[in-house]
Each structure stands twice: as structure tokens, then as C-alpha cells.
């Protein structure tokens, strides 16, 4: 008769089928697991370093924006009192100078146009 056993609907035959791990395989598996754990910890450490640097840079940006906001608040308070802060005055005078330079470059020079119109009129 057949020496096979029925377990959970499957027929199992006696004997050594498949691969049984040897002690060497267990040691190798344990070493691979340890190496994988070391690599995982290293990746985790790098990820946390990156995140900490990101947080610190964002905190610096927030501080700079808060200082800028405070400066603008002070400018607004000064203008409410009828004073024009020197920084705004410098910005305004700088814009006026830029506009005057742009206006002078847009209009052609008078000497060239007069010469051209005179030569046309003379013909």
C-alpha cells in the first residue's frame, strides 16, 4: 500500500523533499538580516538628518519673513502718522529716476529729426 498521508486535503509523501536549512544557511541568514538592519538604520539616520536640515532652513526663512513683516508694519505705522520712511523715499526716488531715463530714451534726439525734416522740405 501507499505510505502517503493526507493532511489538509493534500497528499504528503514520506521522505526528504525540498531543502532543509543547514546550520551554515542559518548563520548566513542571520548575517544577512544583521546587514540589512545596519543598512536600514543608516538610511533612517540620513533621512532624519535631511529632515532636520529642512526644518532648520524653513525656520530661518520664517524668521526672515517675520523680520520683513515687522519692518513693513513699522513703515505703515510711520505713514499713518504722516511720515514717509527713508527706505520708501529711496524706492520712490529710484523709480522716478528710472522713469525719467526711460522717457528720455523713448524720444528721438531733436537734432536728427530736424535734419531729416529739413531735407524733406528742401526737396
Swiss-Prot record:
Gene3D superfamilies, per database record: 1.20.5.170
Compositionally biased spans, kind Polar residues: 114-123
Span list, region Basic motif: 29-60
A biological process term (GO) from this entry: protein stabilization
Record field: compositional bias (Basic residues): 10-21
Pfam families: bZIP_2 (PF07716)
Residues annotated as domain bZIP: 23-86
Signal peptide: none
Annotated region (Disordered), positions in chain: 1-24, 93-123
Region described as Leucine-zipper: 62-69
Protein name as annotated: cAMP-responsive element-binding protein-like 2
Organism of derivation: Rattus norvegicus
Gene name for this UniProt entry: Crebl2
Amino acid at each position: 500500500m501507499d505510505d502517503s498521508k493526507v493532511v489538509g486535503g493534500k497528499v504528503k509523501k514520506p521522505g526528504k523533499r525540498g531543502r532543509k536549512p543547514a546550520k551554515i544557511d542559518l548563520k548566513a541568514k542571520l548575517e544577512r538580516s544583521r546587514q540589512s538592519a545596519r543598512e536600514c538604520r543608516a538610511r533612517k539616520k540620513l533621512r532624519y538628518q535631511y529632515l532636520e536640515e529642512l526644518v532648520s532652513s524653513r525656520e530661518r526663512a520664517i524668521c526672515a519673513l517675520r523680520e520683513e513683516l515687522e519692518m513693513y508694519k513699522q513703515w505703515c505705522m510711520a505713514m499713518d502718522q504722516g511720515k514717509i520712511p527713508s527706505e520708501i523715499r529711496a524706492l520712490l526716488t529710484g523709480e522716478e529716476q528710472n522713469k525719467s531715463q526711460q522717457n528720455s530714451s523713448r524720444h528721438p534726439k531733436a537734432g536728427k529729426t530736424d535734419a531729416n525734416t529739413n531735407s524733406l522740405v528742401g526737396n
